[in-house]
Amino acid sequence: MTAIETLKARLSAHPEIRYSEGPNEIDVIPPDSSGFSVGFRIIPTGFTVNFEGWHEEFTSEDEALDCFAFGLSPNCRLAVVLRGNTETKWVVESLKDGKWTPDSETGLLLQPFWRSARIEYRQNNLLGRGEPRVD
């Protein structure tokens, strides 16, 4: 069973989660405007998981699946930095001991630095707290 087939099987237990799929990818659609998309791709060197503009590559299928599930949980938040209306940086934060802690970030090299920055926080609450996987 491929990782995509595994995800589809696990997501089927959550009919409220909407997603689109391709042969080597799956993308969960945010539940509303306060959420963010979560994607999973099989690539030649392993797997890529993305939360909107943020992304990370994995060689371990289990780690990639865990990261994907984390993006659907209330323990994950995405801080999106905008300059004007342009999204320029995405910071993945995790909830630890009641505090949001930055884990990883992805940003654009070229951005409209002359525009003032603001932060939008986006969060999915599609899985219960502490669920390690989309089971």
Language model features with spans:
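Short, solvent-exposed coil/turn segments at beta-strand boundaries
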Residues: 33, 41-48, 72-76, 97
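A short, charged, amphipathic alpha-helix used as a generic interaction element across diverse proteins
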Residues: 60-72
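Acidic, proline/glycine-rich low-complexity IDRs
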Residues: 73-135
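Generic recognition of long tandem-repeat/solenoid scaffolds
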Residues: 25-31, 48-51, 89-92
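A short, exposed loop/beta-hairpin motif centered on an aromatic-Gly-Thr core
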Residues: 51-59
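Amphipathic alpha-helical segments
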Residues: 1-15
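Structural alpha-beta junctions
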Residues: 12-16, 70-76
